[in-house]
């Protein structure tokens, strides 16, 4: 088993049309590199997993429990499990790195 991975060449999973992720996981955490195309929204949703992340490219609007912010590279967020949230990009695409705990089994592929 290797302890190192590269994002390039890793299989993608479509979240919604125009948004996809590449994931890596251990026993208790899952790392998700999310890419969202311009003019695309990951609609309001919830999951039982705690989610922490950081925007690494572009800008995206994120709403968490009714609080809405425009996030830029370097902006971070923490979303408790069960809290409704969404993300959307305007005229430019965006990329974020998310961490989930516990591991989201549906993201293991």
Predicted regions and their residues:
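Ligand-binding loop in jelly-roll beta-barrel domains
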Residues: 81-106
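Glycine- and acidic-residue-biased ligand/ion/polar-headgroup-sensing regions
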Residues: 49-60, 65
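Conserved GNAT-family N-acetyltransferase fold
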Residues: 34, 53, 77
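Histidine-centered metal-chelating micro-motifs
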Residues: 41-42, 61, 77, 81-86
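Conserved short histidine dyad/triad with adjacent acidic residue
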Residues: 32-46
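A short, N-terminal "cap"/entry segment at the start of jelly-roll beta-barrel domains
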Residues: 1-28, 109
């Amino acid at each position: 088993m290797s302890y190192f991975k590269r994002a390039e060449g890793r299989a993608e999973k479509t979240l919604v049309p125009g948004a996809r992720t590449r994931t890596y996981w251990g026993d208790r955490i899952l790392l998700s590199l999310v890419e969202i195309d311009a003019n695309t929204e990951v609609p309001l949703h919830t999951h039982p997993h705690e989610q922490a992340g950081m925007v690494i490219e572009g800008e995206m609007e994120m709403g968490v429990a009714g609080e809405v912010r425009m996030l830029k590279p370097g902006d971070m967020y923490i979303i408790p499990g069960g809290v409704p949230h969404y993300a959307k990009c305007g005229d430019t695409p965006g990329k974020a790195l998310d961490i989930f705990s516990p591991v989201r089994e549906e993201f293991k592929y």
